[in-house]
């Protein structure tokens, strides 16, 4: 028996692979961006995500669910961000930067009760998303804003994500 044949026989078999949280965050960010550019485009967003990101309909719809929850909480998220940003305004940031801030702040606040995501993970993900979708020069402001907010207890959200969260 060859080594490859024995490796295949011993390899664990999974029914389906879980959707990676990093990929979910990327899809949510892309959906937030698309809806900020075209607020009326939600109807075609699932098919757009399926085509452009090569994901299943289920995963695209799952990302859209998070996008809707973030948008439902956007006034509260933006108020907290505006109160924290000192050197500029939220409106002067790029669309991607604003939406990275909103998404990470939402995830931080959403998951406080059930399964908090460590702040270090959120900061690392923020850095990764900035490098992938924006420019690295903007990262210092984004990270400073999130760091300042994460140092304080998270206020409750008016419209929490139900029935699940980004926990799993």
Swiss-Prot record:
It comes from the Bacteria. The keyword Transcription regulation applies. Keywords: RNA-binding, Transcription, Transcription antitermination, Transcription regulation. GO terms for biological process: DNA-templated transcription termination; transcription antitermination. The keyword DNA-binding does not apply. One of its GO terms (cellular component) is cytosol. One of its GO terms (molecular function) is RNA binding. Involved in transcription antitermination. Required for transcription of ribosomal RNA (rRNA) genes. Binds specifically to the boxA antiterminator sequence of the ribosomal RNA (rrn) operons. Belongs to the NusB family. This is Transcription antitermination protein NusB. It comes from Chlamydia trachomatis serovar D (strain ATCC VR-885 / DSM 19411 / UW-3/Cx).
